């Protein structure tokens, strides 16, 4: 690059700014823009060459041209940044255009889960009994033999203890007692009663397990059992509590309840509870709904209480049974086949 004096350098500097503007505008992408930048601002660029040539000028011209070259450098850098921004915006616009969402397409709603009908019954039962002062117990599903059977007055030779009726676990607890999957929720009542002082007023809903299956039975099923222990509890209290529960659960006063003598090792006397609707599709049919009775004195002793002082009643109902009657389902297995067409109707 050759020049004579400051005037020729001034013209050259002005021309470099114009050239830079043209080169930057012609750059179609970032790589081309960087090449154009090197032509003017690089180590071997035109402005660098001019700065090196300032030594050939006298001090006054050097000061004047140095200021002009710095000004040109700032102008070229401004042009460079503007072009960079323009290219970046163009790239963004192109990407957005290629990723455009067609808002005219029909939307896809998110699949919402629902409450299983048996769990819906569980929650409703809890709500009803809480409203009349009952607490809700919880406990382990893997239980020891004593809490599941012995504490509830089941003799050692009782058929329920056999492997044909109970799922045993190949383990023992810390006291050496055999472990099993609880066959009812009564063990939760045993644990609760041994940790609380009378009056004891509690229900125990939960999963239970027995070696059984069919249209009305399942190896895993749900129960709710109730217990009321105090000094002056009678069968009349049991009938009143359970009748009120049924009328509230089925939302109907058009039902009657009867007690049939029965036998359970943990109650004496014992009774099956039947109900009959006096209107509707089930009118006139007695339906078995629960087992019940006055808590056996030996069970009261196993609670750590004096049966001469404390008395009480207990009852137990299958949550699947209550659900089937409430919704008119005839086959229990439908609840656990995972058919969304069946289950979805309970959440509409």
Swiss-Prot record:
Q: Which UniProt keyword terms apply here?
A: Aminoacyl-tRNA synthetase, ATP-binding, Cytoplasm, Ligase, Magnesium, Metal-binding, Nucleotide-binding, Protein biosynthesis
Provide the GO biological process annotations.
phenylalanyl-tRNA aminoacylation
Q: How is the cofactor bound?
A: Binds 2 magnesium ions per tetramer.
Q: GO molecular-function annotation terms? A: ATP binding; magnesium ion binding; phenylalanine-tRNA ligase activity; tRNA binding
The EC code for this enzyme is 6.1.1.20
| One of the Pfam families matching this protein, by short name | Phe_tRNA-synt_N
Indicate the family of this protein. Answer: Belongs to the class-II aminoacyl-tRNA synthetase family. Phe-tRNA synthetase alpha subunit type 1 subfamily.
What is the primary gene name for this protein? pheS
Q: What is this protein called?
A: Phenylalanine--tRNA ligase alpha subunit
The subcellular location is: Cytoplasm
The UniProt entry's GO CC annotations, sorted and at most eight, read: cytoplasm
* PROSITE patterns per record: AA_TRNA_LIGASE_II
- Major place of residence: cytoplasm
Q: Which reaction does it catalyse?
A: tRNA(Phe) + L-phenylalanine + ATP = L-phenylalanyl-tRNA(Phe) + AMP + diphosphate + H(+)
Q: Provide the binding site for Mg(2+).
A: 268
Q: How does it assemble?
A: Tetramer of two alpha and two beta subunits.
The cofactors required by this protein are: Mg(2+)
Q: Does the keyword Protein biosynthesis apply?
A: yes
Which Gene3D superfamilies does the entry mention?
Bira Bifunctional Protein, Domain 2
């Amino acid at each position: 690059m050759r020049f004579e004096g400051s005037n020729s350098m001034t013209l050259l500097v002005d021309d470099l700014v114009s050239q830079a503007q043209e080169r930057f505008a012609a750059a179609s992408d970032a790589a081309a823009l960087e090449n154009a930048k090197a032509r003017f601002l690089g180590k071997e660029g035109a402005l660098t060459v001019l700065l090196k040539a300032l030594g050939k000028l006298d001090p006054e011209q050097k000061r004047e041209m140095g200021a002009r070259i710095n000004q040109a450098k700032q102008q070229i850098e401004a042009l460079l940044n503007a072009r960079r921004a323009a290219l970046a915006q163009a790239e963004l616009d192109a990407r957005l255009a290629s990723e455009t969402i067609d808002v005219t397409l029909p939307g896809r709603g998110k699949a919402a889960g629902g409450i299983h009908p048996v769990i819906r019954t569980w929650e409703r039962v809890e709500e009803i009994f809480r409203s009349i002062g009952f607490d809700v117990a919880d406990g382990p599903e893997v239980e020891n033999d004593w809490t599941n059977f012995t504490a509830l007055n089941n003799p050692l030779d009782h058929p329920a203890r056999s492997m044909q009726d109970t799922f045993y676990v190949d383990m023992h607890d810390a006291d050496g007692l055999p472990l099993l999957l609880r066959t009812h929720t009564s063990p939760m009542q045993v644990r609760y009663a041994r940790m609380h002082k009378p009056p004891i007023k509690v229900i125990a809903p939960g999963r239970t397990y027995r070696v059984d299956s069919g249209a009305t039975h399942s190896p895993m099923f749900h129960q709710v059992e109730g217990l009321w222990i105090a000094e002056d509890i009678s069968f009349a209290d049991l009938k009143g509590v359970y009748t009120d529960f049924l009328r509230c659960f089925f939302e109907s006063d058009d039902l009657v309840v009867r007690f049939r003598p029965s036998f359970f090792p943990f109650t004496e006397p014992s009774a099956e509870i039947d109900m009959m609707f006096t209107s509707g599709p089930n009118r006139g049919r007695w339906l078995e709904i629960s087992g019940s009775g006055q808590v056996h004195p030996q069970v009261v002793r196993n609670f750590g209480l004096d049966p001469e002082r404390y008395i009480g009643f207990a009852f137990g109902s299958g949550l699947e049974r209550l659900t089937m009657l409430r919704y008119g389902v005839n086959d229990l297995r439908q609840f656990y086949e995972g058919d969304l067409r069946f289950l979805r109707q309970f959440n509409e």
